[in-house]
Amino acid sequence: MNQQLLKEKVAAAVLEHVPENITLGVGSGSTVLCFIEALKQAKRQFRDIVAASETSSKALEAAGFRVRDLNACDPPDIYVDGADEINDDKIMIKGGGAALTREKIIASAAKEFICIIDESKKVAQLGRFPVAVEVIPMARSYVAREIVKLGAEPRWRQGVVTDNGHWILDVHYLDLTAAERMEARINTIAGVVECGIFAQRRADKVLMSQSDGEIVLW
């Protein structure tokens, strides 16, 4: 089973965990786009929907859903999103699509966070995928120098501007053995908007599609 089919399978499977008539938070990324398509096919109805990226908002609206601002509705009952990496402790690396700040805001506001992945995203140790750090543009060089002091290698993702109007540094070789402390440390650097370590607000449930066709919940 190829990766696209695995994404579609887990996106359909999570519908069993998402009741109608709730406030739903929707993340971003390729697996989430499959989830939006599954919502459309199932003709689900929700009280409100909030989205973590402009891309997801447009996909939801194209599927017939009305997207609300987080300030204009109740906190999400459930937030569904993917991950670039996730470990057994449900700590994630996110931000490959540059939507990490809005993803973390909605995840933090939500009562329950369900992460949907295919088996390629499950790792024994975090860090193979670089950690995205959203920065205010004028602070890029300063933040990069501070990150070097942490023993890591920041690289500017040139040409990418986030939905918030900021830039992204992709941080390689970051020591994530104490991911929660590293998340807090990076977020104390002046000019950092948010980082893509999701340790303080990790997933509550994970649904993973395997190449044998099974869906694993943990």
UniProtKB/Swiss-Prot annotation:
UniProt pathway annotation: Carbohydrate degradation; pentose phosphate pathway; D-ribose 5-phosphate from D-ribulose 5-phosphate (non-oxidative stage): step 1/1
SUPFAM superfamilies in the record: D-ribose-5-phosphate isomerase (RpiA), lid domain, NagB/RpiA/CoA transferase-like
* The protein's Enzyme Commission number: 5.3.1.6
Give one GO biological process term: pentose-phosphate shunt, non-oxidative branch
Q: What class of enzyme is it?
A: isomerase
The Gene Ontology terms for molecular function here are: ribose-5-phosphate isomerase activity
Q: Does the keyword Isomerase apply?
A: yes
The protein's UniProt keywords, in alphabetical order, are: Isomerase
- Gene Ontology CC, one term: cytosol
Q: Where is the active site?
A: 103
Locate the residues binding substrate.
Answer: 28-31, 81-84, 94-97, 121
UniProt xrefs under Gene3D superfamilies: 3.30.70.260, 3.40.50.1360
Catalyzed reactions: aldehydo-D-ribose 5-phosphate = D-ribulose 5-phosphate
The answer to whether keyword Isomerase applies is: yes
InterPro entries membership: NagB/RpiA_transferase-like, Ribose5P_isomerase_typA_subgr, Ribose5P_isomerase_type_A
Its subunit composition reads: Homodimer.
Function per UniProt:
Catalyzes the reversible conversion of ribose-5-phosphate to ribulose 5-phosphate.
Family stated for the protein in its record = Belongs to the ribose 5-phosphate isomerase family.
> Which HAMAP family does the annotation name?
Rib_5P_isom_A (MF_00170)
NCBIfam families named in the record: PRK00702.1, rpiA
Query: Under what name is this protein listed?
Result: Ribose-5-phosphate isomerase A
What is the protein's species of origin?
Dichelobacter nodosus (strain VCS1703A)
